[in-house]
């Protein structure tokens, strides 16, 4: 059965608006765990716009489930990953001017570079994932890098303006899941998924994890973190394996 991993970046976004001490993303991570999240995601961006180094360190030290560290493929971030020892490192592209991650990592043509970058991480026993588009060339390239997981970008599906466009994007993702599984990769989905559109994947098999943050944090503002996480976890519990 697929599981829910919760991204707490936007708890930190709210805190950083006032450069204060609350809301505390570490507390949010613990509440998400108590409510049924099977893992916590933090994206430590190079510009530190939301999650800070102390957040990563404290969550890594106190979490009872798994911590996923999203990061750009830079020497600094690799050094942090090797110090923190998260369960999984997920490489994502970054642009300074973007509000959020806008697309998948380009892997095709960079297999040797990315494999070399990840080698010390793998040697430490840390698993890796690549955040990519549901594109056959990128999925095949990801296998050659040696990552155990891919996370397929669902943002274009979530942002679709029409039902036809949404259906096309969904079908592309489903084909991507099937190809990745055929190649021996574990598959996660993430970006823009919410309490409504996630049902489009209810009967899709082969998905290991759903990575969800913004919609859960948005609901948590109104209902509380535990209730928001529990509601999403209950939805995913009905999905195909």
Swiss-Prot record:
What is catalysed by this protein? 3-amino-2-oxopropyl phosphate + 1-deoxy-D-xylulose 5-phosphate = pyridoxine 5'-phosphate + phosphate + 2 H2O + H(+)
Q: What is the active site of this protein?
A: 43 (proton acceptor), 70 (proton acceptor), 191 (proton donor)
Presence of keyword Cytoplasm: yes
Q: Which SUPFAM superfamilies does the UniProt record give? A: Pyridoxine 5'-phosphate synthase (SSF63892)
What function does this protein fulfil?
Catalyzes the complicated ring closure reaction between the two acyclic compounds 1-deoxy-D-xylulose-5-phosphate (DXP) and 3-amino-2-oxopropyl phosphate (1-amino-acetone-3-phosphate or AAP) to form pyridoxine 5'-phosphate (PNP) and inorganic phosphate.
Description of how the protein assembles with itself and partners: Homooctamer; tetramer of dimers.
Name this polypeptide is given = Pyridoxine 5'-phosphate synthase
Gene it is expressed from:
pdxJ
